[in-house]
Amino acid sequence: EARLTNPENKKLLEEGHALVCLNPEIGHILMGTEDVPYCLARVMREGRLAHTHWNSQPLGNYDQDLNVGVISPEITEAALFVLKMYGYTGYFGIDINPERQPVDVALKICMDALRAAADRINSLDYEKVVWAMMHPDKARGWLEAYLIRMRALHPEKLPPLWELPMD
């Protein structure tokens, strides 16, 4: 982009726009055996995320375009966590090929899956999550135990989570 000479392109760059951006599809990231949150973080770090393209995909190189969150919902949550940490406010596109269900039903399911995952992510105690990530020697296992409780339908049935030594 630094070598562009067209005045319109230069103006867009001066306004803070990127002319080359990515639209990563979750399923294609997985087909490439890449880590979804890490891929999104790399794109965000460079300021090149146009918008996201969501679906579910089993591991393997066969593009199935399943409904969001049907397979490995923790990947959806982790990806949303990364986007939230980067302050992403862009669009969430849905790329599915519903089998044996009407398209409008599949779209509603996908939107519900994204909303439910975002609700779980938004309800996290970010101060504790970041502290645990920054102090792994003092928080061994805490983050995993915390996330299990955040996903549990009845977390009160699990043993209480120990306190972090955040002093």
At which residue positions do the language-model features occur?
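Histidine-acidic metal/acid-base catalytic patches
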Residues: 1-167
